[in-house]
Amino acid sequence: MPFTAQTIVDQLQVLIPGVTDAEALGYVNRAYKWLLGSTDIKTEPLEIASVQYQQGYDLSNDILRTDKVLWVTGVDDQSRYTGDELTFTPDKEFINVSYGTPTDYSFYNSRQSSAATTDSKAQIWLYPIPDIDPDGGYPKIVIYGAVYRALTLTDSLSNAVQFEDAILARSKQLLFDDYDPSKSDYWEQKAAKYLRETLDTLNKRQDGLGENLIPTISYSRRTAQ
């Protein structure tokens, strides 16, 4: 089944107990408006018309590389959304994907060297979870990141925290080749610590970038020790 807005609504209602249809659709709508530059709730599948991967990586495989993170630059005023597909202009890519090393300011340097939009407010840092739509639609982590951002921009901060915790809990089941719950605490704590520290660092920045970069989860694909 294609990954649609309703799919996200259904999953939000599982992840956030008690959230209503209207609330969930509101989160999805805000996420889509930010991600697509669209004012409409889109219930049809999202399809990628073309995406350029700077280092040639395919999100459907090899999504996790040890000590690497995924960053995505988002929309700007010249981006276009047509029907069910995202379209790109040659000099203003709607979405730009690359891997980088997670140092304190690597995202800043990556943005400077990117061929995509120079608008700092269009960039979002996403740490990948290998939970990709098998039907070829939008990578779920991109949508989750946008929904997470929508949650943080509303007054439902407690919902955002629940959503964050739910993603963290889900991710540990996805990232270990031979998952063993009894051995996963170290990796879960490491990811949670990194997430909190990164959010704290971004919140303290004075250049206006912090509020526009919403980290989610970071793991390395290693067998739990």
Give the predicted meaning of each segment.
Residues 1-225:
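Glycine-enriched, solvent-exposed interface loops adjoining structured elements
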